[in-house]
Amino acid sequence: HLHGDHYLGLPGLISTMQLLGRERELVLYGPKALWDILQLQFNASNTRVSFPFRFVEVDAEKELLDTSNINVSSIKLNHRISCFGFIFKEKPKQRRINGLLVKQLEVPNYFMNNLREGQDYISSSGELYKNEFLTFPPRKSHSYAFCSDNRIKTNFSDKLKGVSILYHESTFLHKELPRARKTFHTTVKEAAELAVEVKPDLLILGHYSARYKELKEL
């Protein structure tokens, strides 16, 4: 979203990428006005970005990226201005081959992908080997939800069910609840209560108010 503490460093970061010789394409996701701001900044400073640069507007909850191994989608947050978070989900992973066994049984190399996909193996002599015998279970796929400035609404946890890592802002201590409500932020206690509902493997807190000089207060 377009509160200054979340984007004002972006023009400098992009300029630094250029100075360091970046060549790969940069894809930026955000509200349309962010693109207008960047164009204004670059035009005012006569900056020409030398690497491929593409902007994708985020204006609703939708899928933003889908590849062979990851899916990224946006989720609407509840803040004073339009604000979105993101959910990153790894795709299910393939089974892992038991290298020692397949070597002993002389399973041909061309069949390895079939094993990874869960197929059983029939040897040249007609003997059936179950996939579970020749492979190990796939490694766990992880997911990460990034929720920046947000005043938690009822049923918001439904959008986050199943994520393994949850980042959620926790600007205030709970004694500042009236302030949190007024500014559309979340308290540490509320973020923790959200995590109890979502049940992630890990909760990460951040976006603390500058009034707190030491994290132990939180």
Positions of predicted regions on the chain:
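Active-site-proximal loop/helix segment associated with metal-binding centers of metalloenzymes
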Residues: 70-146, 150-159, 165-167
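Hydrophobic packing residues within well-ordered alpha-helices of enzyme cores
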Residues: 10-13, 38-41, 156
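Short active-site oxyanion
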Residues: 24-27, 142-144
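A glycine-rich helix N-cap at a beta->alpha junction
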Residues: 46-58
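Di-metal (Zn2+ and/or Mg2+/Mn2+) metal-binding site signature of metallo-dependent hydrolases
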Residues: 1-19
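Short internal beta-strands
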Residues: 25-33, 204-205
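Binuclear metal-ion centers of metallo-dependent hydrolases, dominated by the metallo-beta-lactamase
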Residues: 60-62, 152-218
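Active-site metal-binding loops of divalent metal-dependent hydrolases
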Residues: 2, 32-33, 101-102, 148-150, ...
